[in-house]
Structures are given as C-alpha cells and as structure tokens.
Amino acid sequence: SLVGSEMCIRDRTGSTVINVKGKYPSEFSEGYASLQINEKWGYIDKTGKIAIEPKYDMAYSFTDGLALVSEGGREGFIDTDGNYVIKLTDKVDYASFSDGYALIRKGNKWGFIDKKGNIVIKPAFYGAADFKEGFASIMEKVGDKYLSGYINKKGKMITKAIYEEVDDFQEGMACVKKNGKYGFINKKGKLVVNAIYDNAFSYENGLAYVAKGSNAYFIDKTGKKVITIK
C-alpha cells in the first residue's frame, strides 16, 4: 500500500513487513522488487533495503538472474549487483529473459538472444513469445494471414505456422487453434488432441479444461474425457 511517497509491503496475513519510501512497486521476483524513487527506478531487497540505486528511467523484474532496464532511451540488462551484463543500446528492443533466452526486436522482426547478449535466433519473425519448456511460439505471414507455429532453442520449427492462436507449452502440451477450433500438440509438434473444441485451457496437474457446445470436460493428455462438468 502507498500513502504519499511512503510505501509499506505486507505479507499474506496483512501484516506490514517493510516500510520504504517509493512508488509503483513491482512484485518481488528472485528476491528483488523494482520501484520508483524521486522519478527514477531502482530495486529493493526483501528487507526493504535499496539493493540497486534508483537511476533508471524504467526497471523491470529480475528473471533468470537479469533485469531489463532503460536509460536515456536505451535498453540493457543488469545483474543483481547492478552491473550491466548486456550493454545499453537503442538499436533493438528487448523483452525480459525466460528459459535462458530473451526476445529481441529489430525493425519489425523478432528473434532471441542468450544471456551473454549473443543473437542465437535471428530476428526473422513477425511475432514471437517467450520460451517455455524449451519452445517458443512464433508468427509468420502466410499469404494474407498471420499464423503461428513453434520453434526449439536452435530455431528449428517443430510445427509450421498453421495455427490461428497458440499458447505457451505447459506440462509438455500446448493449446492451439485451427479452423476456429482448439486442440493440443506435444513437444514433437504432433496434434495429439484433435482441434474439435470451442474453448480450451492449458494443462494443469495432467488435465485440461475443454468445452464443446454446451458440454464441458476435463481431458487427459490423450484427449480422453476424465471428468464431465454438468
């Protein structure tokens, strides 16, 4: 909560555990939270102590040990000591790290860098999402449409860009939409649950919620209906 510039962070019981001056705190991630102090962004640790001095125009959450920050219209990545691991640049746009890689945009195309800043997958896609479980969805122009598929960390397509909508991999499966219907693929790119559903959500604890017409179910990873929702 925030009163003026005095901020308090509470635990799940509602008890105040940290008092610190600042605004717009992020959630803690990897032990740190970003916040704004005197119009600049920095980081505090879980004791409320300033861990990285507020000097950035913007500062994002730590993921994979690195945080995306911006200064003077340029972006780069710092470690938890505040040292630049990937230097500031205005030549490209970045997103935060996930699964060891970060999205990078050059012009209107997207690719990926590793934690040393090396381009490991050249910006060649019209759209892309973070890597999850070793795979990322990408978007390509197919005729007059933009369709999605998936790549592995070597940039190899595991399925062509044939889907209208895609989700991240979760528990080894990814929800995809084809011809207006939803199904699921595995990490080999094989459609193992046919795209026959009007709605579907990602797998959790081995089951996925799906709906077809007025009927709804939880299915297992073979597509078998395990629970019928009445």
Regions found by a protein language model. Give the residues of each.
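Residue-level detector of conserved, function-critical positions
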Residues: 5-6, 11-230
